């Protein structure tokens, strides 16, 4: 089996961030009737879109030689694990905002962010921006989820088209 390269690392990272964006787009469709939830899901969707742009920009700055270097096997394992996530499958099973919150929380604490942080540290050229990027890209998501309030309120906000 050929060794994974940096080009594959970036391709799979972009695929994972795109799946996360699709998940938040789906949450926006399901909970857009609630302004508070809609604001959070739109911000999260926008962030995932920004992650894709960031990854594309960093990849574009790498030389062809760098792109053909071997990728970190542990990061590739984590990415392949993340890519098992199916936004459509999860969205079909959501009944209320509390369900959505828990899946979003799980996604934000998954290996997708570990890989993004790895890429920021390994491939982003400007060290002064690294800490800012990690805070902006990763920690802001967790803070946004807190805006969705407590579990009792989240359970009271039903999805537009709950299953069943």
Per-region residue spans from a language model:
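Non-heme di-metal
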Residues: 1-164
